[in-house]
Amino acid sequence: MTSTLSPPTLALRWTDYPLMDAALAGLCVFCDVRDPEQLTPEHLQEFQQWAQKAYFTPELSGWIAVVFTSNFINYSFSTEKRQEVLRDILSSYQRPDTLSERCTIFPELQAQQRVARDLMPMLMGRGPMNFYPDGQPGLPLSGQAITALQGLSLAAPLVSGRAMILDADDKQLLLDVVNEWQKPWLKRISLSVSKDDKKPIWAAARTRLMEAIRQVLSKQPRGKAHLPFAGGATIYHLSNSGQGPDAAIYTLEQPALRFMERASQEHPEAWKPLFQSKHHAADKTKDSDFGFRNELDEAMFSLPDAAPAFLRRYLLPPFTQALKVAQESGKQASKANRKKDTKKANDGPKPIPLSGLWGITELFLEEVVGMEKARIEAIEALGQRLGEWIVRENDKRLFRELYQARGASPLRHVLLKAMLEKSKQDAKSGAENRDLITTKDEYLRIFTEADELSRADFTLARDLLKMRVIQYLHDARFFEENKDDPELQNTELPTDQGEE
């Protein structure tokens, strides 16, 4: 093998190519620098010394089979041959780039060789010529690029049998997250001494990223209204295995991150129990620290596109549960074994404070849905006026009709009926405060478009109004005081089957 002195500079930089940038982030964290332009030949030599031992551990051998196919771990090779092939890859940056083509990733550099899937994930093998320019298989890469790509071993841990490769709009976030992953990943590699020593696996890639971001945020001073980094992040959860190469792509948008951070900071009393209620502990096959899954974390990757479904699945149920608890409490009170049933009821999960949850819902509408502030305030105000009227008149029938109204016409009927009843009462009592329950302008702002047709998100607005009314009634102890009332007992929980 011919080698030359290392180049005085490596000419490495961020590329906006996810595989390379993740690899560079791994090298930067390993070498304790914050920019790939600061990487030196001495840093790569330090990595080379680590890799020559670590790559032959069972843990990293399995990782290599997933990311770089069998490569130099091919067990048909002798031990000496495998070590020689590895040295050749790790020292690529020390040899001259002699091809006439430019490097695909660093076009300012000449290429050293055309590479296939054994040196760059998700390409084809060395033989096939299809889908390559001029029928020449492989992509031209410089020696620096070939060696740098091995930095993926420092940045892309194996999660559920696939490499978890992160791309971030803000490279400082990429570095910080890789920093959170690298230490436990390297510890796992160092403890891997025997093929028969099967360690519990890492799992739930999306939860792993959210957990790492929370760790990053917990270490940085920040204001409540902003994040210390820009943009979002994407996970490429991939396998380059010859048995079935595949990649799942999960995108985490900035609005979802802002919502998560603000909710946890501004309403911790509601966010913490909500978050914990969606936690699923790791089973015995998974690592206890890196194998658990959280539904809320996973659902963040569906935002903002699936915002209505998110609200209906995670934010609405605690509000409807408040009514259900009151109904169950009323039924238990009439049973002979009341104490036994009450004890069982108290053994359930801690209820989520609805006032805090409504605050979280408002943040969700602001950050994720992008709803205008005037409309949010109108929904909140209408819900409060309805709640005040129901409590004042103890009007359980009105609550029942409002709660079960699904379409625009039934909802308008309920609102008109409430307006009429309040107007009659105000006239009869001579009350000075004769504010209407709602007005035409308020109704149009909440439920209709400019042409006075129902909004496309009418169902969302309807659910938000019900959530606000329930929150007010719950805080006013309306459900608790009327738990035995037949009208409340007969209020059926509506089904949202078929609604999006």
Language-model-derived ranges and their functions:
Residues T40, D170-K171, G407:
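Alpha-helix initiation/capping motif
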Residues M1-E80, L453, T459-L460, L464-V469, ...:
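Conserved small-residue
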Residues M20, L24, D35-Q48, Y55-F56, ...:
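Low-complexity, charged, repeat-rich alpha-helical/coil interaction segments
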Residues K198-E487:
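Intrinsically disordered, low-complexity regulatory regions
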Residues L60-A203:
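Basic, glycine-/proline-tolerant helical and adjacent loop/strand elements
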